[in-house]
Regions:
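Short catalytic helix/loop segments, enriched in acidic residues and glycine
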Residues: 1-2, 32, 94-99
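Conserved catalytic cysteine-centered active-site region
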Residues: 13, 17-72, 106-113, 185-212, ...
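Active-site pocket-lining segment
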Residues: 15, 114-116, 152-160, 240-305
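Active-site-proximal alpha-helical scaffold in enzymes
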Residues: 48-79, 119-148, 219-226, 289-292
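Active-site pocket-shaping loop/turn-to-helix segments
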Residues: 1, 19-22, 45-62, 100-111, ...
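N-terminal extracellular/periplasmic Venus flytrap/periplasmic-binding protein-like
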Residues: 4, 128-230, 293-300
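Flexible glycine-/small-residue-enriched beta->alpha junction loops
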Residues: 70-122
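Short acidic, glycine/serine/threonine-rich loops at helix termini
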Residues: 25-26, 83-89, 166-170, 250-252
Length: 305
């Protein structure tokens, strides 16, 4: 349980955003806090590590507490993919010096092409990718049906103002969002097998074995031991360790292969000690490559899809 406490006691709010530009720019963390009605004294900072931005935000918030900078902090992640500049026809520009030679050309690879590179280097078949994706949908739908996310999803009324040209008025529509829309009940092995490659004409990465575009956000409240005792909060987890690792940009999805062992070493635990593994599955290809390379137990990976 999270008891009431003075919001002014929050030392910092760290928000991860993979594309902190356009509507998500101008320090979206601070803007979000102000729009949410937090006291003006509560600061906010936006951090970016692409896919791991939200994860890094939680780690940064934890480290602020661990180093004594504050007692209470929030780590969060937010992304509105429909508002990203690239979704509106705008091109993302890169520092031109990056392409003065062939050495760093992989910086220009889209994520889909990096997934195809993983397929090639790690020998992941189209059939295995589709099977993994289908299983992920089934697990997510089962978790939703069982109410696993009920206490994690904050119901939100989505309001849309749309022009009605027949009446020359603006029409307000409202709908309640309380369930993730990504998992698809109509997906099947046959339907997935019919999809064409999305990123390379002779590739195997499709829209079906890749994650969908999403808009969403999540946050974690972190406290020191002293703050927990002072507020009477009931912790649900303890922050033990965090690690990052650099890998070739063209196969960026295999980052966990290097980072997971480092995090385990920092925490002083073995891989076999972990009962639940949440692994990035932006593409089935990269998830399978990581699972196989690290010999992870598939039953422990993303149990809820």
């Amino acid at each position: 349980a999270v008891p009431a406490f003075d919001l002014n006691d929050i030392g910092d709010v760290v928000v991860g955003c993979a594309m902190p530009e356009a509507e998500q720019g101008m320090n979206v963390a601070r803007i979000g806090l102000l729009l949410a009605g937090f006291p003006v004294s509560v600061p906010g900072i936006t951090v970016n590590r692409f896919c791991a931005s939200g994860l890094n935000a939680v780690a940064d918030a934890a480290m602020k507490i661990m180093t004594g900078q504050c007692d209470i902090a929030i780590g969060a992640g937010t992304e509105s993919m429909t508002a990203m500049p690239t979704m509106m026809g705008n091109k993302v520009t890169v520092n031109p010096r990056a392409f003065e030679s062939d050495e760093h050309v992989a910086i220009a690879y889209g994520m889909g092409l990096t997934a195809e590179k993983v397929v090639q280097q790690y020998g992941v078949s189209r059939e295995d990718q589709d099977a993994f994706a289908l299983a992920s949908h089934h697990k997510a739908l089962a978790a939703i049906a069982a109410g696993r996310f009920r206490d994690e999803v904050l119901p939100y009324t989505v309001r849309s103002h749309l022009p009605d040209l027949s009446s020359n008025t603006v029409r307000l529509t409202e709908r309640l969002f309380d369930t993730d829309e990504g998992p698809r009940a109509d997906s099947s092995a046959q339907a997935l097998a019919k999809l064409r490659p999305a990123f390379s004409a002779r590739g195997s990465v499709t829209a079906g074995n890749s994650s969908q575009m999403s808009d969403g956000a999540a946050a974690v409240l972190l406290m020191s031991e002293a703050a927990v005792q002072r507020t009477g909060a009931t912790p649900i987890a303890r922050f033990r360790s965090f690690a990052v690792a650099g890998v070739p940009p063209e196969i960026m999805g295999i980052g966990p292969v290097e980072a997971i062992p480092r995090a385990l070493t920092q925490a002083g635990i073995a891989q076999a000690d972990i009962d639940w593994i949440e692994l990035n599955e932006a593409f089935a290809a990269q998830a399978l490559a990581v699972i196989r390379t690290l010999d992870l137990d598939p039953a422990k990976v993303n149990p809820h899809g």
